[in-house]
Regions:
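Positively charged n-region of N-terminal signal peptides that target proteins for export
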Residues: 1-7
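Catalytic His-Asp segment of secreted/periplasmic serine-dependent ester chemistry enzymes
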Residues: 26, 193-273
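N-terminal, intrinsically disordered, polar/charged segments of Gram-positive cell-envelope systems
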Residues: 26-88
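A short helix->loop->beta-strand "cap" motif at the edges of active sites that frequently abuts
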Residues: 180-184
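Generic structural signal for well-ordered alpha-helices
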Residues: 169-173, 214
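Conserved SGNH/GDSL esterase-like catalytic core that processes O-acyl groups on lipids
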Residues: 79-168
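Alpha/beta-hydrolase-fold catalytic nucleophile elbow
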Residues: 151, 188-189
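Hydrophobic membrane-insertion alpha-helices, especially the h-region
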Residues: 10-23
Length: 273
């Protein structure tokens, strides 16, 4: 009898233990399931955030324009003009400009030109124009010009250092600007000499020095109130000298070739209001 009761009690204890184990297992299952769902939600939320960030990265954000505003005026461009453009111009220079006055096409222009003149002769020594007898100061004081063309520097290219030429030339330019504040100043490149001329008189003439001076002049011009014109390029040979076919004496242009100079100028001018 007692054995039977013990067996029944043990059986009940085992049954209760099994039931408790089942309950614990079920609760554990539910807890794990809930945790899994929570983790899944968090992962989904994080993925959504990442996707949102990636989407933001892919959005085309307007960038500042690299183009200059069209309101800023561009520098004027050199272009063709007719001969009347030079009616209110004055040409300043040495014997080459004397030749331009004699054989060129700009008959209504004014001139200040003297054979053998150099940069320091412009204002330091009162050189007189060969035709009018006026000094440069007088020429520029009597009338206001719209354009001023200057070519000078070959006569002392082999003698005067580049630094001295620079000082003298741009001192002259400043004086001209004071007398003619509204004028466009065209700085024409200095015409060189032929190879034979340089070889026959290297003490006075140096084509290499002329090229150095032209490079200097070009670097100092702003393209607006001080405009560089590479006239020499219209007359150079393959070696960079003045072409012998354009100059019988190696220094001055043939009378029939001044029209090349004039043609170059009419094709390279700034518009004037």
């Amino acid at each position: 009898m007692k054995k039977t009761i013990k067996i029944i009690i043990i059986t009940l204890i085992i049954a209760i233990a099994l039931e408790l184990s089942a309950i614990v297992a079920i609760k554990a299952y539910h807890l794990v399931n809930e945790a899994t769902k929570t983790d899944a939600k968090e992962v989904t939320h994080k993925n959504d955030k990442k996707q949102a960030k990636n989407t933001d990265k892919n959005v085309d954000i307007p960038k500042p324009s690299s183009k200059i505003s069209s309101d800023i005026p561009e520098k004027p461009v050199l272009g063709p003009v007719d001969a009347t453009y030079f009616d209110d111009a004055v040409f300043l220079g040495d014997s080459r400009t004397v030749g331009l006055r004699a054989f060129g096409d700009f008959h209504n222009s004014s001139y200040f030109a003297k054979t053998g003149i150099s940069v320091n002769s412009f204002f330091m020594y009162p050189a007189l124009d060969e035709e009018t007898g006026l000094t440069l100061t007088q020429t520029l004081s009597y009338k206001q010009y719209k354009k001023i063309y200057i070519m000078i520097g070959v006569n002392d290219a082999a003698l005067v250092p580049l630094e001295t030429f620079e000082t003298q030339f741009f001192d002259a330019i400043r004086e001209i600007q004071l007398l003619q504040p509204e004028a466009i100043i065209y700085v024409q490149s200095i015409l060189g000499v032929t190879k034979n001329k340089e070889l026959s008189d290297p003490y006075h003439y140096s084509n290499e020095r002329v090229v150095e001076r032209n490079n200097l002049l070009k670097s100092k011009c702003d393209g607006e109130k001080l405009v560089y014109l590479d006239v020499f390029s219209a007359f150079t040979d393959a070696e960079g000298y003045l072409n012998q076919f354009n100059s019988s004496d190696g220094l001055h242009l043939n009378s029939s070739d001044y029209d090349i100079w004039c043609d170059y100028l009419t094709q390279h001018a700034l518009p004037v209001n």
